Amino acid sequence: MFHQRLGCSSISFRHQDLATALHTISGLGFEEIDLGALPGVCDHVPYVLDAEAVEAVAAVVRESGLRVRSVNGDVGDLNTTLDADARLERERHLEMLLSLAAKTGAKALVLPCGATDHEPVGSLEGDIETVGAQLIHASERAKEFGVELWTESLHYFRLCWNTERAQLLADQLTGSNVGIVMDFSHIVASGGNPVDFVERFGDRITHVHLRDAVPATETGPGNINLSIGNGQADFAAGLSALRDIGYTGHFSLELETRDVTHDERPAATAKAGIFITDLIQYPLHTIQGAS
């Protein structure tokens, strides 16, 4: 039913416990997931993560029969200076997330692009350097576990919240193995253009999140919590641009939406999956020529 490179994030069903969410996703016909491990966003993975919790989560995932493309996690504000004890705790949490990624067969761990604040802790340049250094360190640790390290940048609610700041971080990461996760909703909410994002970051894009959004206006902030088709994201143009650069990575419906009820959510997810599958399969010019 769905394209083999299109998965569904467990965040799409964050109101359900993990086993139920995975059963729902599998029942819709998806074969691949992103595993949400974001405190305050999705509780499918305990924030206090120890070896026992890692084994428990991995067992639930294995039982589902679903492939895991990435674990979407957080180890705290990467642009915040920590004391020795806090650094040790962050390192321990990173190790547990990497262990979870490895035990679930994930290709990568995804980390954010800074704190949930547009204002830097110090200078913008200094904060970007700190975030970059932390991500590069995490990517080196990831190698020990046989997985990759990606960052979701830009992210509308974090330090690297627009295209310009995402570019600054990408520049800082030049020469590293850190991949970039492209999220249509965050790009649009920030006033950016998905096609421009693809042209800027090209083959550094390793994964794509799919959700709709509208940009900020004079009277309100951007809204990233819209079902596909209910916002202003040009998925046809963005996916066509990815195809044009030879993108061979995967896509994930991360439908953290607030415009449908929980009862409506499975049908809305299936509808989005069919729509995106068609766009992945057929070039934009083919769709336009048929209209």
Tell me the role of every PLM-derived stretch.
Residues 34, 70, 110, 150, ...:
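Conserved beta-strand positions in the central sheet of alpha/beta enzyme cores
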Residues 1-7, 69-80, 113-118, 217:
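N-terminal small/glycine-rich loop or linker at the start of catalytic domains
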Residues 40-45, 77-82, 117-122, 189, ...:
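A short acidic, helix-capping loop that chelates divalent metal ions and anchors anionic groups
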Residues 1-7, 14-31, 62, 90, ...:
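Histidine-acidic metal/acid-base catalytic patches
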Residues 12-14, 37-39, 74-77, 113-117, ...:
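Active-site-proximal loop/turn and secondary-structure-junction residues that shape catalytic pockets
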Residues 43-49, 84-87, 125-126, 222-228:
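Short glycine-enriched, charge-decorated loop/helix-capping segments at active-site entrances
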Residues 19-20, 60-63, 67, 79-180:
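Active-site acidic/histidine proton-transfer and metal-coordination neighborhood
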Residues 36-58, 113-119:
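Glycine-rich, proline-tolerant flexible connector loops at the mouths of alpha/beta enzymes
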